Amino acid sequence: YPQQPQPFPQQPIPQQPQPYPQQPQPFSQQPIPQQPQPYPQQPQPFPQQPIPLQPHQPYTQQTIWSMV
């Protein structure tokens, strides 16, 4: 039994090239564009715009002076 040759001949297995791994994946190929977050970049409008100083009504001031 040790002398009996292997029935399976050492025939070279034809390596058929797999086409799917060779072609590059398109999603992996193209670089992902890093879109910058707009919310932190754009300044908050409420602190940015200066608060308009309301002009003092003269009648209110006059009333205060009159009361004194």
Curated annotation (Swiss-Prot):
Amino acid composition bias (Pro residues), ranges on this chain: 1-24, 33-55
Residue numbers spanned by region Disordered: 1-68
Annotated Polar residues bias: 59-68
MF term (GO), any: nutrient reservoir activity
Keywords assigned: Seed storage protein, Storage protein
Signal peptide location: none
Tissue: Developing endosperm.
Key word Signal present: no
Zinc keyword on record: no
UniProt superkingdom: Eukaryota
Function of the protein: Sulfur-poor seed storage protein.
Protein name (database record): C-hordein
